[in-house]
Design a protein with these regions (language model features):
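N-terminal subdomain of nucleotide-sugar transferases
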Residues: 1-37
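Conserved beta-strand elements of the Class I
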Residues: 3, 91, 199-200
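Conserved nucleotide-sugar phosphate-binding/catalytic loop shared by glycosyltransferases and other
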Residues: 27-73, 77
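A nucleotide-sugar donor-handling region in carbohydrate enzymes
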Residues: 34-36, 40-41, 141-209
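Proline-aspartate-enriched helix->loop->beta-strand connector
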Residues: 86-88
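An aromatic- and histidine-rich active-site surface loop
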Residues: 91-109
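A short, histidine- and acid-enriched strand-loop-helix "catalytic/donor-clamping" loop
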Residues: 115-129, 143
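Membrane-proximal helix-turn-helix segments that form the acceptor-binding/catalytic region
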Residues: 131-144
Length: 209
């Protein structure tokens, strides 16, 4: 049993191709998708795009939620699900609060953890905040480290992670692009722009709010 856990739009984009791949082998792998819905609306958009249906949805998002509230609700919910499902491996992605909490819940239940997009570091615990600490703690807990680049692998080796536990896999964002790039996407805004140049800016970083 392999349980993928994510809660935000960026996680969903990068984990969806992995979920789709796991589901190609139903006889060998029981794929279980669990979402915390740390970002509800943005998460649902991605799930619909990739046609991924969660097996478990904690739906923890609340207006003006604090990090403590997210952590508490996610930890309790994931602990209950893990006790019920008893997966053999938990896969998490990146550096969100969901990532950190899912890893911690797996540790408490003595379940192996695989960390996708492992090894990114700034070495400054407040930049990005709280993501740098989230990914460092997840790195301590993880049994398998799927690093996107050789630089990420070097960071993990610097932290004395075992070389045999590290796999340089590239970034699953490329896989997500390959899944969607052939879609004949149309939108009235794009029709109005025509061939004009466009800048797309997404700015929801905690530091910008």
């Amino acid at each position: 049993k392999v349980m993928t856990i994510f809660g935000t739009r960026p996680e969903a984009i990068k984990m969806a191709p992995l979920v789709l791949e796991l589901e190609k082998y139903p006889e060998e792998i029981e794929s279980i998708v669990t979402v915390t819905a740390q970002h509800r609306e943005m998460l649902d958009q991605v799930l619909e795009l990739f046609k991924v249906t969660p097996d478990h949805d904690l739906n923890i998002m609340k207006s003006r939620q604090t990090l403590t509230e997210v952590t508490t609700r996610a930890l309790e919910g994931l602990d209950n699900i893990m006790k019920e499902v008893k997966p053999d491996l938990v896969l998490v992605h990146g550096d969100t609060t969901t990532t950190f909490v899912a890893s911690l819940a797996a540790l408490y239940n003595q379940i192996a953890v695989g960390h996708v997009e492992a090894g990114l570091r700034t070495w400054n615990k407040y930049s990005p905040f709280p993501e740098e600490v989230n990914r460092q703690i997840t790195g301590v807990i993880a049994d398998l480290h799927f690093a996107p680049t050789q630089k990420s692998e070097e960071n993990l080796l610097t932290e004395n992670k075992k070389a045999e536990s590290i796999y340089v896999t590239g970034n699953t964002a490329i896989d997500a692009l390959n899944v969607t790039v052939n879609d004949d996407y149309k939108h009235e805004v794009l029709d109005k722009i025509g061939d004009d140049r466009m800048i797309l800016l997404t700015a929801h970083r905690r530091e910008n709010l």
